[in-house]
Every structure is written in structure tokens, then in C-alpha cells.
Regions:
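Transmembrane-helix signature of polytopic, membrane-embedded enzymes
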Residues: 8-10, 87-110
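Short helix- or helix-capping micro-motifs
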Residues: 15, 104-109, 157, 161, ...
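Extracytoplasmic catalytic/substrate-binding loops of multi-pass membrane glycan-assembly enzymes
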Residues: 23-38, 47-61, 66-70, 214
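Transmembrane-helix motifs of polytopic, lipid-linked glycan transferases
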Residues: 74-95, 133
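Short acidic/glycine- and proline-prone juxtamembrane loop motifs at membrane-interface regions
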Residues: 119-126
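Membrane-interface transmembrane helices that cradle and orient dolichyl/undecaprenyl
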Residues: 134-149, 254-261
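Transmembrane-lumen/periplasm boundary regions of multi-pass, lipid-linked membrane glycan transferases
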Residues: 170-261
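Membrane-proximal, lumen/periplasm-facing interface regions of secretory-pathway glyco-
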Residues: 312-373, 382-385, 389-393, 399-401, ...
């Protein structure tokens, strides 16, 4: 017997609510630093820190419109809406009735993950729906006994590598799960091996780029681990609770139990364990398990369907309200610094103050007597992206990540307006004088707040050597 019918009307209502809410709030506090960075990157087959898909989307959309971030965020909104639908379809594959599908869709619509990564265009926005699609296809292959769905899963995973190579961790988790808890015969299936081959074939340009550029993703991963591991390893356990919201933890834990009790899909529990272990060992970012938790949540809703009533409806509503306040620009920008929101949601923190910062940096640049041999060099890509977006008349460079390779100041440059935390290094390379301190004016303590703006002259090394000294990955 096949799965229950798709309850499209009951699933699409919460999907539409999420899409409308995200669209209404899309301009919000302004661009996130990563959005500004992606928009500044010129199209390429890959970058030291990213595959090409999300930067290509951001650059293309940003070039169509020079106003706020709403257009840039349309793909993120679509990904969040897609995540709601896909998670409901996962519940259906697991035997969920129309009621279970509706509860799953409404539940996913209330999560911090869907609202945070649906509000800002990041690689995580795409991964949230891409990982769900891979898992949905694998479930269809196993539960419907239609192995051709393995090929679809492989194709989706191959496309997902253009967004982030992290999807390979999901595939590794599936392989480990099949090997450890079965069904082991799948490891001998030509459909599974065909899926693996299709992933490699579709993602081949990514492989070629990595091999011909000295495996930059490994270098980037090591840099992130060195910089972040001390914070990521303790915080990832907190993130497991807040990713979908504290009220939903009970449901996704019940989902893991339900998946474990079904021999056909028990391997998915191992997938979750592998992703959690990878997150801990790599220490790069805390949010990676978020991409597989929706599957466990859907399984939990199906398992707990008869217990879901008015009390759980209230809990879902509370979860949605708290998630919205955390994830979306509902608190006025002038007041948000006095709330916990910037501390809980770093994306909100990283979206506040860019116009003020650009004005302050621009004032230092405009005050220079000679612009012909002057540039702005920023310590991070957010500052560079903001200037490129809001002051296109200023020549701006950064030696962080992919911007290091994209361009460096001309050899004849004699004066630099240097912005941010690299001033100590710059003092050994130039004669520098601090002329301002960045201030967003709303008391939000983000990465830029209080950072110096310095005028640096008389470079002591040729620019190729200076640029190498300023280069950093993080």
C-alpha cells in the first residue's frame, strides 16, 4: 500500500504564511554581511570558501536592483517555503495522514531555522531544502520499494554540491548508516552505486576546481576550525535545542526513536549521529545538524499524531512567536540593542549599521587630498561588500577569503584608508593614524562597532608582498 494522499491545501497554508511573513520583513535591518560579500564576488566556478551557486545568485540579483535586500532574499524565502513543503512530504512518506502533514508543516513554519535562513540569503538557506530533498528521495526509494529514487537523490546531491560541499557529509552518513544498521544489501545495489556516480558526475566541475586550486575547501575548513572550535563545540548542543525551538525537541527525539524502530529507515538515525559527530569534530559551525533535524521532526509528528491537540497547538504558536522575534526584524532597530536578539541571532547583529559605517568610512576617504593613489582596504568582507554596494565610487579591497584572489590595490597606491581589526598588522607595513571609530548609532555590539578607521601612508613593501601579509581565511 502506498503512502496517504498529499494534503496540499493543509500543507500550502502554513507554507504561504511563511512566504508572506518573510516577504513583508525582507528589507528589515538591511543586508547581512555574507549577502554583501556574495554580491561583491564576481561569477566563478568556485571560491576558496564557497562553491559558486549562492554567490552567483546574490551577484546576479544584486546587479538588477540597487536598493534594499528584498530582491536578493527571494531565493531564501523560496527555500524556506520549500523546506516546509518537503518536511510535510517526509511525514507523508512515513505514513503521516493529512493531519500529520498539516502539523508537520505548521511546526516547521514556526522554527527558528526556517525563519532565520529564510530571511537572509546564505548557503544554509539552500542546504535546508536540499538536504530535505535528498532524504525525501531516499525515503521514497526505501519505503515504496522504488529504487530509482536513489538516482534522483544522487542528482539532487550533485546539484547541492554547487551550494556547499557539506552535503557530502549527509551522503557519508547514509553510507555509514546502511553499513552499520542496514539494510546492508543496499550497499550492493546498482541503484545506490548509480546514485553515487550521478552525484560525482553532476558535481564534477566542483571536484575539478578543488583539485586544480590546491583543495581550498580543506584549507578553509581548517581555518574555521582553528578560529571557531572553542565556541562551536559547547554551543552546538544549545543549537540542537534552539534550531527548531525548545517545544519541538520532544517531537524530534520521538522521531529518532520511531525511525530506529523501523528497520527500513533505521539508518537515518545514524545519519543524524554522523552529522552531529562531524559538527563536533570539525568545530567549524554549530548549525550543521539543523539540516537533518526536520526529518526527525516529521517522523516524530507521525509517531505522536494522536497526542497532538490543543496544548501542542499553543506550544507551536508560542514557538512561532518567539522564533519570529528572534529571526525577523520585528523589534525596531533603535531598540534592538537593548534586547537579547542580537546576542541570540548573529545574522541580525551582522545586518545592522552598514549605512552608518559606510558614511564614516566614506568621510575618511573623501577627506584625502589625493584620490588618484588612494584606496580603502577593509579587514573583513562585510565592510568591503557594504562599500562596494553603497559607495561604488570608492575603490575598495579586502584580503579576506575569496576577495584576496579577486583583486588587490594597484602597485602605485600610496595611501590606504584601513578599516577594522587588521590595524595592528598594518602598523608594521605603513605609517598609520586613526581618524575615526565605527559607530552604528544604535548600541548594537557587532563585529564592526568601535573598530578603527585609519589613514595609512608610505607602504614599506611592494604591494604583492603587502597583500600576502594581509591575507587571512576565516
Amino acid at each position: 500500500m502506498g503512502p496517504p494522499p498529499v494534503a496540499w491545501r493543509r500543507v500550502l497554508l502554513p507554507t504561504a504564511v511563511v512566504a508572506v511573513l518573510l516577504t513583508v520583513c525582507s528589507n528589515g535591518y538591511g543586508f547581512d554581511r555574507d549577502e554583501l560579500y556574495f554580491a561583491m564576488l564576481r561569477p566563478a566556478w568556485g571560491y576558496v570558501d564557497q562553491p559558486p551557486l549562492t554567490p552567483l545568485l546574490a551577484h546576479g540579483l544584486a546587479s538588477l536592483y540597487d536598493g534594499g535586500p528584498w530582491l536578493l532574499r527571494v531565493p531564501a524565502t523560496l527555500c524556506a517555503a520549500g523546506c516546509v513543503v518537503v518536511t510535510a512530504l517526509v511525514a507523508r512518506e512515513l505514513g503521516g495522514s493529512a493531519k500529520a502533514q498539516a502539523w508537520t508543516a505548521w511546526g516547521m513554519a514556526t522554527t527558528t531555522a526556517a525563519l532565520v535562513f529564510g530571511h537572509v540569503l546564505l548557503t544554509s538557506s539552500v542546504d535546508l531544502v536540499a538536504w530535505g530533498l535528498v532524504c525525501l528521495c531516499v525515503l521514497r526509494a526505501e519505503l515504496r520499494e522504488q529504487p530509482r529514487w536513489w538516482l534522483v537523490a544522487g542528482a539532487v546531491a550533485g546539484v547541492a554540491t554547487y551550494n556547499k560541499l557539506l552535503v557530502l557529509v549527509l551522503l557519508a552518513g547514509i553510507a555509514v548508516g546502511l553499513a552499520l544498521v542496514g539494510p546492508r544489501r543496499r550497499l550492493l545495489s546498482p541503484w545506490v552505486w548509480g546514485a553515487a556516480g550521478l552525484t560525482v558526475l553532476v558535481g564534477l566541475p566542483n571536484v575539478v576546481y578543488q583539485l586544480t586550486h590546491d583543495l581550498p575547501q580543506l584549507r578553509m575548513g581548517r581555518a574555521l576550525s582553528e578560529n571557531n572550535a572553542g565556541d562551536v563545540r559547547p554551543f552546538m548542543w544549545v543549537f540542537l535545542v534552539i534550531a527548531l525551538g525548545p517545544p519541538l525537541v520532544v517531537i524530534w527525539l520521538a522521531g529518532l526513536r520511531a525511525l530506529w524502530r523501523d528497520e527500513r529507515v533505521r539508518f537515518l538515525v545514524v545519519v543524524v549521529a554522523v552529522v552531529v559527530l562531524f559538527t563536533f569534530v570539525s568545530g567549524a559551525q554549530p548549525h550543521y545538524p539543523m539540516f537533518v533535524l526536520p526529518v526527525a521532526f516529521a517522523a516524530g509528528v507521525v509517531a505522536m499524531e494522536r497526542h497532538l491537540g490543543r496544548v501542542w497547538g499553543v506550544l507551536f504558536a508560542v514557538n512561532g512567536a518567539v522564533s519570529a522575534v528572534i529571526a525577523l526584524p520585528l523589534v525596531p532597530v533603535g531598540s534592538v540593542g537593548a534586547t537579547p536578539v542580537p546576542d541570540v541571532n548573529l545574522l541580525a547583529q551582522d545586518s545592522i549599521g552598514w549605512p552608518a559605517y559606510v558614511d564614516q568610512i566614506g568621510a575618511a576617504y573623501d577627506g584625502l587630498p589625493d584620490h588618484a593613489h588612494a584606496v580603502v582596504v577593509t579587514s573583513n568582507y562585510g565592510e568591503a561588500g557594504a562599500l562596494a554596494r553603497m559607495r561604488p565610487d570608492v575603490r575598495v579591497f579586502s584580503a579576506q577569503n575569496a576577495l584576496f584572489d579577486q583583486a588587490r590595490p594597484p602597485d602605485g597606491t600610496t595611501t590606504v584608508v584601513l578599516v577594522g581589526g587588521q590595524l595592528p598588522e598594518a602598523r608594521g607595513l605603513f605609517t598609520c593614524r586613526v581618524v575615526a571609530r565605527l559607530d552604528n548609532g544604535v548600541d548594537v555590539d557587532n563585529e564592526e562597532q568601535g573598530q578603527p578607521v585609519a589613514v595609512c601612508r608610505d607602504p614599506r613593501l611592494p604591494w604583492p608582498q603587502l597583500w600576502d601579509r594581509l591575507h587571512h581565511l576565516d
